[in-house]
């Protein structure tokens, strides 16, 4: 599913959080500072898009291309596409894994990485950050 891929890549990025804590989030995901700012500012709208279009549990391979794979931008099929950074599915997956880990500080890195996607998603109670 799209969600499984999001959390898979979210785990990789969370691992980077622990492995290279001195690096910025933008460096970890490969974004420019502007792309990182765009992702943070629009996190709530990105999440709303996934929910409203009911694509989290979809297995359509095209969703991987649109939201996970490297491309010049993420393909929402909206006017804002060309402004968006690539791989926003990975970015949202990262935020889900981070919220899960924050809610379970007793778990080791290995335990977090070994949790299945469904557990991480449900127990994260993911809520996108509000734009500042």
Mark where each language-model region is:
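C-terminal soluble interaction/assembly domains
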Residues: 57-132
């Amino acid at each position: 599913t799209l969600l499984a891929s999001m959390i898979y890549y979210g785990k990789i990025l969370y691992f980077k959080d622990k492995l290279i804590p001195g690096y910025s989030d933008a460096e970890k995901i490969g974004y420019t500072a502007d792309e990182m700012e765009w992702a943070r500012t629009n996190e709530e709208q990105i999440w709303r898009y996934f929910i409203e279009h009911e694509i989290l549990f979809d297995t359509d391979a095209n969703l991987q291309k649109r939201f996970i794979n490297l491309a010049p931008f993420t393909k929402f099929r909206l006017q804002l596409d060309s402004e968006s950074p690539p791989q926003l599915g990975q970015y949202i997956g990262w935020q889900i894994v981070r919220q899960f880990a924050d809610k379970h500080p007793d778990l080791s890195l290995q335990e977090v990485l070994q949790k299945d996607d469904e557990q991480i998603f449900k127990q994260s109670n993911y809520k996108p950050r509000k734009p500042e």
